[in-house]
Amino acid sequence: MRAAALAATMTELADAGYASLTLDGVARRAGVHKTTLYRRWGTREAIVLEAMLEYASERVPIPDTGSLHDDLLALASSAAATATTPQGEAMVRAVAAAGGHDAALAAANHRFWTERLALDGEIVKRAVARGDARPDVDPVEVIEAVLGPIYFRLLVTGNRPGRAFIERIVDLAAGGATASCEPRT
């Protein structure tokens, strides 16, 4: 039931958008009664949050290649590929459109990114532990430096992030995380 409900939520999000998404619609699509959804999740925001986390964890795994650069490249590539699927685009646009006007969605979005950035930050923590990144680097900021330009392209310019673009932003972020801490003159 859980898997069907979460998949139905992502499909409903892609088809109807967040503003029109209802637990009735999700229940119909999942083939369950809406009271089942209310008992388990309670609110539309709660099921959307869990569906987004599940969707992202399935499609954007946390890589562990042994190389900071390669891990960031794999993460950025899978994030961009996921964000350009119908469900991924709906997820990104729903959060961008409703987040500023819908306090519950804004809170769910904040929880999503707090959890996801902490998970992704493990890439950088492993690099620090291997001696491949500066010990003073903030793992979340490195991940934001990689993912931020991807979402900027999708939301602001409407451009899809191509492979060359992804490689350039990863080069910049990895370079910053591994650069010497010596003072500039």
Placement of each model-derived feature along the sequence:
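Helix-turn-helix
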Residues: 4, 8, 12-46, 50
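Short loop-to-helix capping motifs
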Residues: 16, 43, 98-105
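Tryptophan-centric aromatic hotspots in well-structured domains and transmembrane helices
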Residues: 40-41, 147, 151-152
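C-terminal peripheral helix-coil segments that are non-catalytic and often amphipathic
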Residues: 74, 118, 122, 126-129, ...
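Helix-loop "lid/cap" segments that line or gate small-molecule binding pockets
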Residues: 77-83, 91-101, 170-176
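Amphipathic alpha-helical packing segments from all-alpha helical-bundle domains
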Residues: 86-90, 103-129, 140
